[in-house]
């Protein structure tokens, strides 16, 4: 192996070093001095690096006790305080939550605390139609003037100001409960009507009700007469209410419908919330005797008038039982084909017709029959006929009885050769005993 010989006159040539070698301090050996180990060199290097890092961190972070940059914390806190100081005290609440898909059609409204509402705008999202409403006199609330539609998307913007004039705004977009997921009960009689003593409260629901107890318990019917009123279910979609005996003449009946949010069955919820009142008029109960072909009208318990009639023929007798007038028509068409008598009659202008059953029993004027049949023989297909004129003019028994009758008056048929009318065929639940009626209640 080649050896390099050095001397003062012949210095050693410079040796090339690797980058790693350049980083290492030259090792010198001092005679008599302890030899440094590789571990010591590494320790010194790490210590030096740590010190440099500490200096760098100190330079970046600064002295915590010195003034200067605070990472923006004090500035942000000041901005937050200013924003809080400028925020309105008016807090707006919208009853229908933003994004809701099953909002009530009745309870939509706006309330504010710490201020007053200045304006509220509710629109149907698809059509842009504005829903009219009104802010309360004290400015604390707003309600729409009409019931909202089912299954409709709405947008609401409400603005208010506090006592210092600072504004607040609240927005909400929501969709009302769909018709597929809700139920409605069509009811009779209507609010404000005056009806006869036999008029029940009758609900017909547009969906099958399986949760009958909850639905019935959220409909309260009461009378100023103090009579006990009980509900009775006919199947799963009809619920009627009546007292044990006919309503007291002159009394006021009130029904409170609180079905909004009530579960009627799987996947269906009620949406109605309202109070309805109607008045019971004078008492009028008319009794038709098929043996004599006469009808006796009693007004407030006293005989008022007797009228000759022509009831059902022997082939088509009239139902027996208590029947309630449910509809009145100055003139109507009666077509036999609609009730199983196809081709036997089709009279387009029957005068003074009043419905007694949903299957087609009426008490009505008759201008086509001979005057001799009234009070003597039954000639109809099951209706009760009264002498009348074509067009309904003149002074006739048919016209008189029509004018003297109310929806809800009772017509009792007796001594007919037919069966008693079914209690759910029309508004004829009076044909059930009180015990049987109460047995049909779900409450």
Where are these regions (language model features)?
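Soluble periplasmic/extracytoplasmic beta-strand elements of cell-envelope proteins
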Residues: 93, 109-111, 121, 155, ...
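Sec-exported extracytoplasmic/periplasmic mature domains
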Residues: 117, 153, 159, 206-210, ...
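A short, structured loop/turn motif at beta-sheet edges
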Residues: 163-164, 248-249, 319, 357-358, ...
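Exported/periplasmic cell-wall-interacting domains
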Residues: 336-443
């Amino acid at each position: 192996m080649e050896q390099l010989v050095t001397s003062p006159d012949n210095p050693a040539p410079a040796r090339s070093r690797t980058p790693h070698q350049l980083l290492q301090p030259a090792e010198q050996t001092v005679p008599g001095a302890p030899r440094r180990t590789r571990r010591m060199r590494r320790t010194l290097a790490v210590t030096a690096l740590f010190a440099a890092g500490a200096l760098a961190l100190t330079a970046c972070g600064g002295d915590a006790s010195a003034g200067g940059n605070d990472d923006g914390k004090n500035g942000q806190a000041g901005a937050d305080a200013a924003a809080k100081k400028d925020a309105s005290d008016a807090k707006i609440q919208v009853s229908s939550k933003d994004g809701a898909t099953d909002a009530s059609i009745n309870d939509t409204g706006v309330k504010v605390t710490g201020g007053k509402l200045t304006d509220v705008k509710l629109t149907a999202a698809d059509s842009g139609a504005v829903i009219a409403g009104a802010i309360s006199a004290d400015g604390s609330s707003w309600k729409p003037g009409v019931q909202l539609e089912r299954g409709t998307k709405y947008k609401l913007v409400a603005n208010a100001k506090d006592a210092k004039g600072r504004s607040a705004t609240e927005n909400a977009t929501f969709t009302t409960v769909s018709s597929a997921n809700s139920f409605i009960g069509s009811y009779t009689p209507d609010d404000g009507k005056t009806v006869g003593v036999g008029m029940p409260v009758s609900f017909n629901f547009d969906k099958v009700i399986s949760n009958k107890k909850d639905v019935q318990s959220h409909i309260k019917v009461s009378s100023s007469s103090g009579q006990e009123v009980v509900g009775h279910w006919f199947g799963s979609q009809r619920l009627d209410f009546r007292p044990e005996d006919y309503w007291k003449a002159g009394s006021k009946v009130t029904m409170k419908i609180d079905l909004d949010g009530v579960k009627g069955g799987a996947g269906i919820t009620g949406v109605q919330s309202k109070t309805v009142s109607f008045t019971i008029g004078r008492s009028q109960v008319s009794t038709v005797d098929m043996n004599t072909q006469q009808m006796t009208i009693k007004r407030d318990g006293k005989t008022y008038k007797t009228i000759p009639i022509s009831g059902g023929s022997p082939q088509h007798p009239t139902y027996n039982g208590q029947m309630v007038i449910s509809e009145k028509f100055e003139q109507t068409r009666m077509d036999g084909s609609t009730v199983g008598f196809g081709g036997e009659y089709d009279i387009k202008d029957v005068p003074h017709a009043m419905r007694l059953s949903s299957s087609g029993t009426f008490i009505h004027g008759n201008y086509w029959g001979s005057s001799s049949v009234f009070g003597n023989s039954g000639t109809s297909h099951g209706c009760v006929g009264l002498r009348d004129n074509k067009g309904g003019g003149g002074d006739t028994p048919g016209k008189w009885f029509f004018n003297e009758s109310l929806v809800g008056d009772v017509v009792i048929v007796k001594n007919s050769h037919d069966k008693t009318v079914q209690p759910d065929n029309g508004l004829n639940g009076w044909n059930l005993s009180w015990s049987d009626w109460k047995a049909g209640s779900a409450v």
